[in-house]
Amino acid sequence: MKQSSDHDYFPQNYQQSRESFRASVDLLKTQKSLGQWAIPGKNDHDLFVDHAWFPPLEKAETLFVLTSGIHGSETYAGAAIQMMFINEIFPKIDRRHIGIFIVH
């Protein structure tokens, strides 16, 4: 679903970012695997790294990996780029020979 402006791709917080990513991946009508890695922490027991795997539709020749950032402010920009990629670019990709792995 295309956002009304590019600004709308930026999440307000971690939870919104996570929910938007998972919902957008779920909406894609293609073969996929959506997963998560739990991140243990002293104070926060609700941290996860979500990931989505889209296998090539035919023979694998290329792998494209897109990450959102490791920590701090770059994660918001990275999450916005991922949402724009999923909603606007992904549907236009010829996926016959490319696997796509997105680490959110």
Which ranges hold each PLM region?
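Structured catalytic-domain cores with a bias toward divalent-metal coordination
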Residues: 1-104
